[in-house]
UniProtKB/Swiss-Prot annotation:
Family to which the UniProt record says this protein belongs: Belongs to the major facilitator superfamily. EmrB family.
Note: Overexpression causes homocysteine accumulation and reverses rspA-mediated suppression of rpoS.
Gene Ontology CC terms: plasma membrane
Protein name according to UniProt: Probable transport protein HsrA
Origin organism lineage: Bacteria, Pseudomonadati, Pseudomonadota, Gammaproteobacteria, Enterobacterales
Superkingdom of the organism of origin: Bacteria
Length: 475
């Protein structure tokens, strides 16, 4: 392999890390600025939720298409298109003069966001042998952990000392740098052409949109609960129709043969089950600290920083842990630990010393980081190059929806305890944390289906290896 091509492949993880950082930052920085944007556009803060929902639904709808587009036109072409759309959408959002304009431009942003990270990860899957994939994905995930810490703080700073427009303008230099770097370092992997499954796209895409909408409606109590549940049931019906369609179609959008890969099926179901519990922490903890303990919003937001810090520190140790314990023992054990850590938040009180609140959050961050890395890599471990794009899309969709599902479930549990007479606000949060902890511990049973040898292809040592294939210069 030439030195030029080696440098090109070495730059690929940096491109994926940039994409992850942009998405993670954008997901958290906007919430802080919503009141300021609402004031500038002469709308109520509640109405600004449409700017968030429009992006979320667009991403949910188009993630499944990202794999087909990358297979058909190449990873470099689609990735540069995605970053371009995300960057131009950010510029347009900053220039918006009304809420309808902002919503439209957020949709454009969402089109880019739906393809950016999945295509970058697909390129990694095809470029690196499985035994090199774990440390590479670890590296890529780190900037994504910094984004949620930096987002709320940076959003507050920009709104306070500049204007809300800079919330979007900050994406532009990052996007331009990403484009230049991608043109130089992103390989243009393609596969054999296959016909686009338009019927499958409509069934699967609408199912995801309705499911996301139903969860949002249920969690935010925007409409009556029965309406939200009807939307969710309809989405499940469309998903069942897609399954029937996929069985009769030679080349469906998402092949059902994926789920014949045992580690993939366990990883997907495990992602959904465990994130029901872990997804509640960023939602419940700031609420309990503010509503129950009386903390100020800024302090409550900063209290989540130890979780992200623990996640970053744990990334450097995940590979060693997996090599020592294996995937099965690691995932079962760490999921039980996470469940116990979530449940122990029921022991916290306003009178506790601040370090007694910070330390459990730090430990939880380390545990969650280990779990997510192990869970995501075992899901992709045994996929072939032919089904890597579809499997990667399913994983991205699962991650997108399961976080919302975790928030909705924990909100529903909290509402149940709020209806109990004779309980204080703090006790209601305590009972909710105990319930979500039990759910998380129970989800560990899913990973007991793994064999002790599963994932060995990811963690075995190799003296010298190289990426699977480097495209020719013509690609």
């Amino acid at each position: 392999m030439s030195d030029k091509k080696k440098r090109s492949m070495a730059g690929l993880p940096w491109i994926a890390a940039m994409a992850f950082f942009m998405q993670a930052l954008d997901a958290t920085i906007l919430n802080t600025a919503l009141p300021a944007i609402a004031h500038s556009l002469n709308r109520s803060p509640l109405a600004m939720q449409s700017a968030i929902i429009s992006y979320t639904l667009t991403v949910a709808m188009l993630i499944p298409v990202s794999g087909w587009l990358a297979d058909r036109f190449g990873t470099r072409r689609i990735f540069t298109l995605a970053v371009s759309l995300f960057t131009l959408g950010s510029l347009a959002c900053a220039l918006s003069n009304s809420l309808p304009q902002l919503v439209v431009f957020r949709v454009i942003q969402g089109i880019g966001g739906a393809m950016m990270m999945p295509v970058a990860r697909l390129a990694l899957l095809r470029a690196y042998p499985r035994n090199e994939l774990l440390p590479v994905l670890n590296f890529v995930a780190m900037p994504g952990l910094v984004g949620p810490i930096l987002g709320p703080v940076l959003g507050g700073v920009l709104v306070t000392w500049a204007t809300w427009h800079w919330i979007f303008l900050i994406n532009i230099p990052i996007g331009i740098a990403g484009l230049l770097y991608a043109r130089k370092h992103m390989p243009n992997f393609t596969t054999a052409r296959r016909r686009f499954d338009i019927t499958g796209f409509l069934l699967f895409g609408l199912s995801l949109v309705l499911f996301s909408s139903g969860i949002e409606l249920f969690g935010e109590k925007i409409v009556a609960s029965w309406i939200a549940l009807t939307v969710i049931v309809t989405s499940i019906g469309l998903l069942l129709l897609y399954i029937l369609h996929a069985r009769r179609t030679p080349n469906p959008l998402i092949s059902l043969d994926l789920f014949k890969t045992r580690t993939f099926s366990i990883g997907i179901v495990g992602n959904i089950a465990t994130r029901l519990g872990t997804g509640c922490v960023p939602f419940l903890m700031p609420l309990m600290l503010q509503v129950g303990f009386g903390y100020q919003a800024f302090i409550a937001g900063c209290m989540m920083a130890p979780t992200a810090l623990g996640s970053i520190i744990a990334k450097s140790m995940v590979t060693q842990v997996l090599r020592r314990l294996g995937y099965r023992h690691t995932l079962v054990g760490i999921t039980v630990i996470i469940g116990l850590m979530i449940a122990q938040f029921s022991l916290q009180s306003p009178a506790m010393a601040i370090w007694m609140l910070i330390l459990p959050l730090f430990i939880l961050g380390m545990a969650m980081s280990t779990q997510f890395t192990a869970m995501n890599t075992i899901t992709l471990a045994d996929l072939t190059d032919d089904n890597a794009s579809s499997g990667n899309s399913v994983l991205a969709v699962t991650q997108q929806l399961s976080i919302s599902l975790g928030v909705a479930v924990s909100a529903a549990v909290l509402r149940v305890y709020e209806g109990m007479e004779g309980t204080t606000t703090v006790e209601q949060f305590h009972y909710t944390f105990i319930t979500m902890g039990i759910i998380t511990v129970a989800s560990a049973a899913m990973f007991m289906l793994l064999k002790t040898t599963d994932g060995n292809n990811l963690i075995k040592r190799q003296r010298k290896s190289k990426p699977n294939r480097v495209p020719s210069e013509s690609e």
